[in-house]
From Swiss-Prot:
<keyword id="KW-0812">Transmembrane</keyword>
<keyword id="KW-0813">Transport</keyword>
<feature type="transmembrane region" description="Helical">
    <location>
        <begin position="35"/>
        <end position="55"/>
    </location>
</feature>
<dbReference type="GO" id="GO:0048038">
    <property type="term" value="F:quinone binding"/>
</dbReference>
<keyword id="KW-1278">Translocase</keyword>
<dbReference type="GO" id="GO:0050136">
    <property type="term" value="F:NADH:ubiquinone reductase (non-electrogenic) activity"/>
</dbReference>
<keyword id="KW-1003">Cell membrane</keyword>
<keyword id="KW-0520">NAD</keyword>
<dbReference type="InterPro" id="IPR039428">
    <property type="entry name" value="NUOK/Mnh_C1-like"/>
</dbReference>
<dbReference type="InterPro" id="IPR001133">
    <property type="entry name" value="NADH_UbQ_OxRdtase_chain4L/K"/>
</dbReference>
<keyword id="KW-0997">Cell inner membrane</keyword>
<comment type="similarity">
    <text>Belongs to the complex I subunit 4L family.</text>
</comment>
<keyword id="KW-1133">Transmembrane helix</keyword>
<dbReference type="GO" id="GO:0030964">
    <property type="term" value="C:NADH dehydrogenase complex"/>
</dbReference>
<comment type="subunit">
    <text>NDH-1 is composed of 14 different subunits. Subunits NuoA, H, J, K, L, M, N constitute the membrane sector of the complex.</text>
</comment>
<dbReference type="GO" id="GO:0042773">
    <property type="term" value="P:ATP synthesis coupled electron transport"/>
</dbReference>
<keyword id="KW-0874">Quinone</keyword>
Length: 106
């Protein structure tokens, strides 16, 4: 595994993670669909996880990989709760457009 990282280089992993994170930010800021925004947040989380794994492999330390394992478990719970909330919103409003959420009474 270390040979692959040396051949590719840590800089390329950093560039890839920055590009993925920027795609996620773009999706959150410029899209109004809740599912697209939710997927964009997951892309941002995966970019950070990839960076953790790349740095932990580069420094030959497993702590970053262990952190990513727990982060993925939390992300799975986040996906379950987030999709349940989106399904509930769709049932009430028949739309998942973020602009329609201001019509909800709390």
């Amino acid at each position: 595994m270390n040979n692959i990282l040396v051949e590719i280089g840590i800089e390329n992993y950093i560039y890839l993670c920055v590009v993925l994170f920027c795609i996620g930010i773009f999706g959150v800021l410029y899209r109004r669909n809740a599912i697209i925004m939710f997927m964009s947040i997951e892309i941002m989380l995966n970019a950070v996880n990839l960076l953790f794994v790349a740095f932990s492999t580069f420094h030959q330390d497993a702590q970053g990989q262990v952190f990513v394992f727990f982060s993925m478990a939390v992300a799975a719970a986040e996906v379950a709760v987030g999709l349940a909330i989106l399904v509930s919103i769709y049932r009430n409003l028949s739309s998942i457009d973020i602009d329609n959420l201001k019509n909800l009474k709390g």
